[in-house]
Amino acid sequence: VVILREIAEKFRRRRLESGAVQINVPEINVWLADDRTITINRINRESPGRMLVSEIMIMANWLTARFLKTNRMPAIFRSQPAPRERLYKEEEGTLFQNWMQRKLLSRFVLNTVAEHHTGLGLNAYVTATSPIRKYFDLVTQRQIRAALGLEPLYTAEEIDQIIQSLEQPMGNIAKTQYARQRYWLLKYLEGQIGMKTEAIVLAKRRNNHVIILKEFMTECRLPLSAGIKLKPEYLVQVTVQHVDARRDLLSVFMG
């Protein structure tokens, strides 16, 4: 395990030196028990164990992509243009900067040929480590088997057709997963009216500020308060005032 951790750390360092954009934002896990009790867990995605698994997975996907690229085989390659702006270097960003940096990332692109993935700092990338859950990963593994003479090779046209057929449905799945998590998070907060919690100011709008509740890593609006000037990255205390999960409403006030 120690050796694997050293390999993972060196690989991450190499990616960062190649311009990777490392986003370090806590993950919020919403768990619904059989009795409909909702539990919220805040997970550190940068714990040693999670970092090791993440980096080794990225390495495996990169090595697979490099093999396919070297052998000039079509595959579902992922690339990503440079972000619209960089807010920090390597892993130096604050929670505010990491959250805002994620908003500035360019959308990833799926193609049959390898191109640079700026977000990961790699010259080629595919996903291949979850063939049971993800069809794209299964297609990648089939291409590897084809390279070994174990089954027919997908042509570039067939790969492109797969991308066109599944890209939109997969995008819809991601939106549904986000909406489901936010719904149950708000459902939990419906029972926390009057709770005080810390928030970070993200931006100012005409009639309110956009803030993120640190404990729950979710955004909401904070009404402007007379005589109080808030700037992005300010830390404030707010009180949960009203929540309606079905209508996607979360209201808070200062104090």
What does each model-identified segment do?
Residues 1-251, 255:
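Electropositive polyanion-binding surfaces
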